[in-house]
Amino acid sequence: MKFTPEFASGLLIQRYKRFLTDITLEDGTEVTIHCPNTGSMRNCLFPGNKVWFSVSNNPKRKYSRTWEQAQTPDGDIIGINTGRANALAEEAINAGTIVELQGYESLRREVKYGSENSRIDILLTSDAQANCYVEVKSCTLLENGQGYFPDAVTTRGQKHLRELMEMVEQGHRAVLLFVVQHTGIHSVKAAEHIDPAYAKLLSEAHATGVEVLAYSADMSPIAASLVKSCPVKL
């Protein structure tokens, strides 16, 4: 996906109240921008380092700027906006980049499913294949050279795993897709040290037939796209 106009830049001061971030613009002005990431953002916050943001022309928005990307001290780029993960996944599926998800005739977003009343991120259907339920997760946590998910305890994520398992039991195909929005992550693993219940459930889901995939994003202030498969350590 191309960003038009391309993202503007500044320097990070602080993130607070989950949805707010203070930055310094290139001209030295300090402003508050919207943070579209509700997670802990563990190892994603580097005060003084470069950040990039988009600008909305919607006059009803209190904060016109949205934090999109951050640079680490090592020079890696992190995609802060978790909302872009689904769009990156959809674009990659349509382009045939995710080879494991090729061959479907229809793609729908946010379809209701499961006994716990969730909405699947992507539902792929085809007359010749079983329905494929794809749950998308953004992976941005890098610790000691290893990529992890989640970055905080996620009961919602646990619910999604249970419902993917339910789809497999019903004869459908179920896929957990990690969209890796950190250029320094080269493999993904369940963060047992952060959410042991999620790690245990992921292992159970995989054993029952839920497929676990990860694809890495190439990112810049101009564009972003999923470009290659990333190993998942189960």
Swiss-Prot record:
One of its GO terms (molecular function) is DNA binding. InterPro entries: SfsA, SfsA_C, SfsA_N. It comes from the Bacteria. Belongs to the SfsA family. This is Sugar fermentation stimulation protein homolog. It comes from Shewanella piezotolerans (strain WP3 / JCM 13877).
